[in-house]
């Protein structure tokens, strides 16, 4: 049996959101193939980035609730837990 993760309870929703993003990326590919207007393509890319940001924030929330406050896997020392979490936040913000 797979270990329980912070997103386990919302896994179906997470998979739906990821499938939607996947469809959006395919749509942008078609737009480029069809030589669509640059601003329209960039608008769709911005929407994809926003959707991914929302997914990532949900994962961070689940991680904080499950792995930091609960009994999830990861570092056992609070300082290491915070360092790990802040590293993930930093990677999100540095793109």
Language-model features and meaning:
Residues 1-95:
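Solvent-exposed interaction patches of small proteins and small membrane subunits
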């Amino acid at each position: 049996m797979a270990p329980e993760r912070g997103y386990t309870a919302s896994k179906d929703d997470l998979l739906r959101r990821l499938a939607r993003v996947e469809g959006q990326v395919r749509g942008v590919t078609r737009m480029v193939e069809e030589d669509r207007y640059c601003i329209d393509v960039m608008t769709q890319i911005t929407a994809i980035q926003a959707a991914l940001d929302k997914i990532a924030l949900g994962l961070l929330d689940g991680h904080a609730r499950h792995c930091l406050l609960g009994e999830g896997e990861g570092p056992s020392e609070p300082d290491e837990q915070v360092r790990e979490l802040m590293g993930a936040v930093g990677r999100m913000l540095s793109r």
